[in-house]
């Protein structure tokens, strides 16, 4: 169950250092995303999204990050889903990119806001039609009697939009942006003496593992 990570001496892999953030956290995160994609990691933009419900109980799930910029990271979902309800009561979240095969992870946390309708529409237009229909068919996080019933709902919306060249954005669907209040880069190293670099309040600092 234990994984041994690399080191400069062991495999020649360079140590994560504050200098790697000379161009800012966005540049390094994008570079690591590209490295994960090049390594063949499935869905390298997957994040473990953490929220808390109205009672303060934490919940995590995996979603896909769809954009990274100087303001933060963005994902899209059903606003009426469990995560949407959590964010309505506590608009703060954490997100972790877990690249186990590379011995890397990046953690982002901060306040959450909905993106504009224009940004949602732009992303929606790039989704495959099947994904668009699936978003209409599913009342996300709500109970359903069977998969057959879910497929019936999909068939119904497929028929409803059969004569439409484009499928409109559902009224309860859109994006959220996590404003990057804290960003932490982690690199697994030999003997569990890992590298951790945190960006917070304009400061870049090394943390003990």
From Swiss-Prot:
Function: Catalyzes the oxidation of either pyridoxine 5'-phosphate (PNP) or pyridoxamine 5'-phosphate (PMP) into pyridoxal 5'-phosphate (PLP).
One MF term in the entry's GO annotations: pyridoxamine phosphate oxidase activity
Pfam families tied to this protein: PNP_phzG_C, PNPOx_N
Binding of FMN, residues: 61-66, 76-77, 83, 105, 140-141, 186, 196
Pathways per UniProt: Cofactor metabolism; pyridoxal 5'-phosphate salvage; pyridoxal 5'-phosphate from pyridoxamine 5'-phosphate: step 1/1; Cofactor metabolism; pyridoxal 5'-phosphate salvage; pyridoxal 5'-phosphate from pyridoxine 5'-phosphate: step 1/1
Transmembrane segments: none
Entries under NCBIfam families matching the protein: pdxH (TIGR00558), PRK05679.1 (NF004231)
PANTHER family for this protein: PYRIDOXINE-5'-PHOSPHATE OXIDASE, PYRIDOXINE-5-PHOSPHATE OXIDASE
Oligomer and partners: Homodimer.
Catalytic reaction list: pyridoxamine 5'-phosphate + O2 + H2O = pyridoxal 5'-phosphate + H2O2 + NH4(+); pyridoxine 5'-phosphate + O2 = pyridoxal 5'-phosphate + H2O2
SUPFAM superfamilies: FMN-binding split barrel (SSF50475)
Single Gene Ontology BP annotation: pyridoxine biosynthetic process
Cofactor notes: Binds 1 FMN per subunit.
Name of the featured protein: Pyridoxine/pyridoxamine 5'-phosphate oxidase
HAMAP family in the cross-refs: PdxH
Organism: Mycobacterium sp. (strain JLS)
Highest taxon above the source species: Bacteria
Organism taxonomic ancestry: Bacteria, Bacillati, Actinomycetota, Actinomycetes, Mycobacteriales
Enzyme Commission code: 1.4.3.5
InterPro entries in UniProt: Pyridox_Oxase (IPR000659), Pyridox_Oxase_CS (IPR019740), Pyridox_Oxase_N (IPR011576), Pyridoxamine_oxidase_dimer_C (IPR019576), Split_barrel_FMN-bd (IPR012349)
Cofactor(s) required, per the database record: FMN
Coiled-coil residues: none
